[in-house]
Amino acid sequence: MSDYKNTLNLPETGFPMRGDLAKREPEMLSRWYKEGLYQAIRQAKSGKKTFILHDGPPYANGNIHIGHSVNKILKDIIIKSKGLSGFDSPYIPGWDCHGLPIELKVEQIVGKPGEKVSAAQFREECRKYAYEQIEAQKKDFIRLGVLGDWDKPYLTMDYKTEANTIRALARIIANGHLLKGAKPVHWCTACGSSLAEAEVEYYDKTSPSIDVRFRAVDSNAVAAKFGVVTDKPISLVIWTTTPWTLPANRAIALNGEFNYALVSFDDECVILAADLVEHVMKRIGVTDWAVLGECKGSDLELLRFNHPFMGFDVPAILGDHVTLDAGTGAVHTAPGHGPDDFVIGQKYGLEVANPVGPNGCYLPNTYPTLDGVFVFKANDVIVELLKEKGALLHHEAMQHSYPCCWRHKTPVIFRATPQWFIGMDKNGLRQQSLKEIKGVKWIPDWGQARIESMVENRPDWCISRQRTWGTPMSLFVHKETQEPHPRTLELMEEVAKRVEVSGIQAWWDLDIRELLGDEADDYMKTPDTLDVWFDSGSTHSTVVDARPEFHGNSADLYLEGSDQHRGWFMSSLMISTAIKGKAPYREVLTHGFTVDGQGRKMSKSIGNTVSPQDVMNKLGADILRLWVASTDYTGEIAVSDEILKRSADTYRRIRNTARFFLANLNGFDPAKHQVKPEEMVILDRWAVGRAKAAQEDILKHYENYDFHNVIQRLMQFCSVEMGSFYLDIIKDRQYTAKSDSVARRSCQTALYHIIEALVRWMAPIMSFTADEIWAQLPGERAKFVFTQEWYTDLFGLEASETLNDEYWAELLAVRSEVNKVLEQARTDKQLRGSLEAAVTLYADKALAEKLNALGNELRFVLLTSQATVADIHDAPENALASDMAGLKIVLSKAQGEKCPRCWHYATDIGQVAEHADLCGRCVTNVAGNGEERKFA
């Protein structure tokens, strides 16, 4: 018996079965950098239509976590897919560099500014620290396989960006959106600074819940409003969980539309919202009471009530913000300690009292027992004071959600301070922003309603901060009036020019006389810095408008976590609308937060965090990228060892499919060996057509940012259409046909076209593996797949052909039925492999006609040694019914002997003396012109 191994076309490739990604990926990254991959992409895409994804800058502090990885990988998938779609899509990564977290870190190292180091030295240390953090984060982002201009990222602390941020503020001033005034802002006593809305988080806190009497100055006049006469004292009762704000009380708000009741019990009368009387009486433990009369809230407007301990009286005022959700229907109003209170206070001309210092302690001369006391400690003092004065109606502890500093996790207060604001309503900014929101595509679409409601309800934006490390507001204000200099815009440009050369320190080093000359004695420099959300929110102007690679185009897409509706999406919208009158983006895409396999938030204390560095070092970045792409990122994104293991399994299946393609392209030169479509075996054309259909779906999914559907379609193509059908069938032809025959070259032509498309589908997601496949593909080609576009040479079967896609879909179904019978026979130990079988298909007329169309090649599709078609009416009793109408199956042992070369059973073995042990087909392939295949 001869050894025919050398006559077979055995698969061979340098593409290894195991990815070994953790080891190989860093080597690839090194090559990408040395060979200038990002620059090569820029060059290849030069002059194409731009697509700009503007990077929301992560904060330059700490290691990257799994959430950062999700964000950067999603952005990279989009950038790469847009490049393949023929766009010039530069990616300029950025970092947010100013602000409190860095100050706090630097304070731990060098102390507070003005103590051991000067403010200038402190800023320099902050800059140095930010650079160190950026370098560390940059390495991890690059390791993820994210391509971008890492040598020239944008930093909000770049001198030019700092200067452009000042210019952005100047444009807002020019458009009339800047306001100044003492307004209540979120204030962190630990930071000693105001906080942006996005820097406030809510946690449960226990507070005193108190009902307080404000006695009527003239009880008779009040009783008359209710149409009654009484000699009992009358009080208007307020309910609050912040007793510490009572020293700043300047009014009591009622709702003009509500009915209020005068309720008598014991030796007093109280005024309560009529709908809340029973609820309040139950809360304060009073069972015997009577309603003497009712009136509208509007009837009580401007009646006066005595403050319980401050020695003055306050008016009853009307406001729509008063609800019946809780309390008494009367709201204690302190314009210096709350935005609603402030707004209504402005309407009634109330004093904006602020008796609290920046450290959270009462200022001198507030009240004898309160001066110097920290506000949250003062709650107990005030409760006792109210008891003494006979003003405390009820007191209990209550747990509720309370605003806290995102950094310190400590409760914040509302505190009126002199600040600068972007006015939401001064020049129509709110209305224009709401109009702009409607012109943006929000993905998912619920993002639109979310940001609309935030814009509708948000207060003026306080953009000033009392910090050391930040972009200076760069205003010169009059020492007496605090009004900005008449030449403010011109002066700000002068400051910006200096900052562009020397950084923000130029502002603090600036001698006021240098710019103001003789006016210097009347003016002072504002000490305030800009809110860091202004820094990042103005990057559409300071970066996108300024970078040459964007060619003056605005951003197409912003992509961040769903918390950024109130953060970066909001600040960017406000600033862009204030400067340009339009939104800074055309599309906004949000992703959810990462949770563990059980849906719990990631937490170091629970110990359920997943480190991207660990995943990359163990499994490789392509597995991490595949996990991100496989997840519907619009909701919560679950990650665990088990979930990553599933991604690794998916990866292996895709890799093995690619390896099969490459191994079977051994010896194929597309320039010499391609078979024309019309001369190809029909099944091969079908396979290329399946790739064409898959590509249409995949490109649509990429365009819609539906990456989990890209992976599902890719897996369906690799595992079902290719793996369990086409690749199974072609092994025989690929391995046993004459090496240079049309039968084999047709198959290789199909494999070549398909892998050219497949490697491109993979490239945005499994970037390292796609690069590895690209290097193994036959034929002349560019150095990198990432400089290419989607493959355009796919073709398929025409619908008008007899053996069209519909035909092959039916054949697939027949094969599936045959496979079930073969599988059962294997289980029953009747046969070991399908080639030991002969199959007879008893079919109805229509199906029989289709099956007979393949002639002798039907057996290759069914992977049996023999296949016969017969009339269903002739089916014997032992024929197995199938799930297909009009088909019964009989399985028997194949006739003849097993050919040692192709392993098929044949009755013509030994008919050629020189190859006595071969079947006739193999003799033709070894010694003749090679078998002909037309269908399969």
From Swiss-Prot:
Cofactors: Zn(2+)
Record-listed Zn(2+) binding positions: 899, 902, 919, 922
EC class of the enzyme, as a word: ligase
Gene Ontology CC entries for this record: cytosol
Renumbered ranges of motif 'KMSKS' region: 601-605
Molecular function, one GO term: ATP binding
Localization in the cell: Cytoplasm
PROSITE patterns, A to Z: AA_TRNA_LIGASE_I (PS00178)
Main subcellular location: cytoplasm
Catalytic activity, as annotated: tRNA(Ile) + L-isoleucine + ATP = L-isoleucyl-tRNA(Ile) + AMP + diphosphate
CDD domains recorded: Anticodon_Ia_Ile_BEm, IleRS_core
Positions annotated to bind ATP: 604
CC cofactor note: Binds 1 zinc ion per subunit.
GO BP, sorted A to Z: isoleucyl-tRNA aminoacylation
Motif 'HIGH' region in this chain: 58-68
Annotated L-isoleucyl-5'-AMP binding sites: 560
Protein keywords: Aminoacyl-tRNA synthetase, ATP-binding, Cytoplasm, Ligase, Metal-binding, Nucleotide-binding, Protein biosynthesis, Zinc
PANTHER family: ISOLEUCINE--TRNA LIGASE, MITOCHONDRIAL (PTHR42765:SF1), SOLEUCYL-TRNA SYNTHETASE (PTHR42765)
NCBIfam families assigned: ileS
Quaternary organization: Monomer.
Free-text note regarding domains: IleRS has two distinct active sites: one for aminoacylation and one for editing. The misactivated valine is translocated from the active site to the editing site, which sterically excludes the correctly activated isoleucine. The single editing site contains two valyl binding pockets, one specific for each substrate (Val-AMP or Val-tRNA(Ile)).
Similarity field: Belongs to the class-I aminoacyl-tRNA synthetase family. IleS type 1 subfamily.
UniProt protein name: Isoleucine--tRNA ligase
